[in-house]
Amino acid sequence: MGLSLVLSCGVIAGISGFLFGYDSGIMTTTIAQEQFLQQFKPKESMVGTIVAIMQAGGFFGCLTAGKLSDLWGRRKAIMFGCVFVVVGGALQAAAYHTAMLLIGRLVTGFGVGSLTMTVPVYQAEISPPRWRGTIVGCQQLMLAIGSAIANWTGYGCSFVNSSFQWRMPLALQAVPGIVLFFGSYFLPESPRWLVEHDALDAALHVVQRLYPDKQNLDSAYAEFQEIVEQIKQEKAQASERSYLQIFRRKAWRKRLFLGAGIWLMLNLTGINVINYYLTQFFTSLGYKGRRAIFLSGVYGSVGAATTFLALFFVHRLSRKTPLMMANISQTATLIVMAGLTAASELGKSGQMGGVAMIFLFFVIYCSTWGPLSWVYASEIFPTQIRSKGYSMASAVNCEWRFYFLFVATNFISALVLLFLYPETSGKSLEAIDLLFDDHQTIHRSTLEENEVRRTSESVNAKH
């Protein structure tokens, strides 16, 4: 009981992070497998679609899970996401044409997105304050382990000369989904969700189980009372907890923007671009085929080891300072990486330097942004809107941003056209000048009046 139970719950629920890492990582190696390329013969644009469509499903999974998590509870919402992961993995492994593969990726993405929203909220709500950073950070550790295993699985299967080369790795996506589904039966429900639904006795029992030893029972009861009073106060302040209400209340709106901002800044570090197209990066540096897949495996292993070590310190660190220092360090790393990639004449030393910069970038990320982003985004929302708020914030962590980047630019372009660009259709070139307040321009009506006046004067002179 106590800390061992909290850690067990964090690790079991963290299998969702393993799913996220494995599902993302396995496609990195799959799109480089010879048998996969022979089966689907994808063009470069289709490769991008195969990679990104999972995150499109994840976007909708995040938004759906917020409501379901409030209605059903955190445990049932986790099980809900697992069903989609298992079905999606089966569809991908059995795919014989691109459409079936895309549907499988979309379904899997929906499940992973649902879990990405639900699990960090659950982990934050069951964790004593002192250990919250470590427990929620388990999500990133499991993600790193999943990514590493995906890379090594892809490397091992690359030696097989049949469709097993890519079907087996894709089929394995379903295994952690099944484990998490049945493991969820043994997880205690979130005490904050229980209090929210007036199950006070059950909530107190869970809180007492989650505290380290009997000497802390008084502290457990004190925290229980704090949870009850906080939720009671939140209910009194606002009975409505819709998504729209989050935007209406200033304090909630600020939390949402901060939570979404964390994920947006994480993605703008460039980590997902590097992870998804890792083998292509290595190929551009001269490490092709199986060598690129092997380096991907080493890359994933380094990330898992770094994250594991970081969890021993994350609960002792502040949140902001490590993130800011990481951004500065990653900026320098990316500049060097870009220079080495561009300077192809540097030869083998330049190639090795480029690989080293990729690894250094990943080490910095895994020790800072990796675990701390999950922690910060999950702990800033009040219980009353934690699921809905985090679901909207975590949706930013899905790769729909690659599309919504263009959604944003198109929408902004529409506004610019509406308010700044004058309409020119049906106007003469001279009349168009008037639209820009050109005082040197003579309006057509003025020209016509002058012409009429000159004609009239000419006629009168003749008479």
UniProtKB/Swiss-Prot annotation:
Gene name, Swiss-Prot/TrEMBL: criB
Membrane topology reported for the UniProt record: Multi-pass membrane protein
SUPFAM superfamilies tied to this protein: MFS general substrate transporter
The protein's name: MFS-type transporter criB
Subcellular location(s) per record: Membrane
Residues passing through the membrane, by range: 5-27, 46-66, 83-103, 106-126, 141-161, 168-188, 256-276, 293-313, 323-343, 355-375, 402-422
Family: Belongs to the major facilitator superfamily. Sugar transporter (TC 2.A.1.1) family.
UniProt keyword annotations, A-Z: Membrane, Transmembrane, Transmembrane helix, Transport
Function: MFS-type transporter; part of the gene cluster that mediates the biosynthesis of echinulin family alkaloid.
